UniProtKB/Swiss-Prot annotation:
Species assigned in the record: Buthus israelis
GO cellular component terms listed in the entry, alphabetical order: extracellular region
Listed name of the protein: Potassium channel toxin alpha-KTx 16.6
InterPro entries noted in UniProt: Scorpion_toxin-like_sf, Scorpion_toxinS_K_inh
Lineage: Eukaryota, Metazoa, Ecdysozoa, Arthropoda, Chelicerata
Recorded domain comment: Has the structural arrangement of an alpha-helix connected to a beta-sheet by disulfide bonds (CSalpha/beta).
Subcellular location: Secreted
Record carries keyword Signal: yes
C-alpha cells in the first residue's frame, strides 16, 4: 500500500510538470489543424490544439 501511494504521488508530480509545458501562442484559430504549422515553427513540434480560438502548443 505504501508503494502505491508513492507511485501515485510521483504520477501527479509528473502530470503537473507535463501540463505546465504547454503554452499559448498569439495565433487565432478555429480548428486544431490551423495550429500545427505555427506551433512547429515556434516549438519544433506539431503537437497543438485550438482552445478558446487560440493555439496551444505542447
Amino acid at each position: 500500500m505504501k508503494i502505491l501511494s508513492v507511485l501515485l504521488i510521483a504520477l501527479i508530480i509528473c502530470s503537473i510538470n507535463i501540463c505546465s509545458e504547454a503554452g499559448l501562442i498569439d495565433v487565432r484559430c478555429y480548428a486544431s489543424r490551423e495550429c500545427w504549422e505555427p506551433c512547429r515553427r515556434v516549438t519544433g513540434s506539431a503537437q497543438a490544439k485550438c482552445q478558446n480560438n487560440q493555439c496551444r502548443c505542447y
